[in-house]
Amino acid sequence: MASRWQNMGTSVRRRSLQHQEQLEDSKELQPVVSHQETSVGALGSLCRQFQRRLPLRAVNLNLRAGPSWKRLETPEPGQQGLQAAARSAKSALGAVSQRIQESCQSGTKWLVETQVKARRRKRGAQKGSGSPTHSLSQKSTRLSGAAPAHSAADPWEKEHHRLSVRMGSHAHPLRRSRREAAFRSPYSSTEPLCSPSESDSDLEPVGAGIQHLQKLSQELDEAIMAEERKQALSDRQGFILKDVYASP
């Protein structure tokens, strides 16, 4: 009996000690949990304030263009050299043809501008040469027709008519000298700077060069196609031989 009572006392003591330890642990954990709750609450309030103040904006991903995919199949060295030569030849031919086309366009544009300028000068010269003679003839007819009618009326008109008859062709020397100088200047010539035959002769080698380049590019394409056909036939024969040797 005494031993049983002793065992019961030790068990009760152990239970009381365990209970005290649990209480101490719970007391220590309570401030940590409360501190975490307060920190979470402060962060939540800050997030709410920022959500209210800062508006949402569109996100710029700054995505660049995708990678340039290359061929996974490695061509043979002979094909690599042929393809590189074809690419370089095509690029050179394209650059040369572009330059020739630009020069042709600039030449045709210059020819059109010169022709238009020449026509304008011709029209201006025709207008300038036709209008003064017409006005002078009208004035002379008016004076000749009006003089006999008013010959006995006004002596001043008679004197003016006499002076005009005496002056004759020297009535307006300054205007005529200016007009003659304008017609003698090289800028008033109505002929174009270059004749159509010269322009055609300048454009003939350009056209021949373009045709030659087109012919070269066509021959190069045909050679490339023939080489590709030969390569395809050789590959096919190789596959057939492999199948024959592999079959029992």
Curated annotation (Swiss-Prot):
Residues 1-10, 132-143, 186-198 have a biased composition (Polar residues). InterPro entries: RCS1. GO terms for cellular component: nucleolus; nucleoplasm. A motif (D-box 2) lies at residues 53-56. A motif (D-box 1) lies at residues 14-17. One of its GO terms (biological process) is cell division. It is found in: Nucleus; Nucleus, Nucleolus. The keyword Methyltransferase does not apply. Ubiquitinated by the anaphase-promoting complex/cyclosome (APC/C) complex in the presence of FZR1, leading to its degradation by the proteasome during mitotic exit. However, degradation is not essential for normal mitotic progression within a single cell cycle. Isoform 1 and isoform 2 interact with PICALM; this interaction may target PICALM to the nucleus. During mitosis, associates with HDAC2 and MTA2 subunits of the chromatin-remodeling NuRD complex; this association is strongest at prometaphase and decreases as the cell progresses through metaphase and anaphase. This is Protein PIMREG. It comes from Homo sapiens (Human). The lineage of its organism: Eukaryota, Metazoa, Chordata, Craniata, Vertebrata.
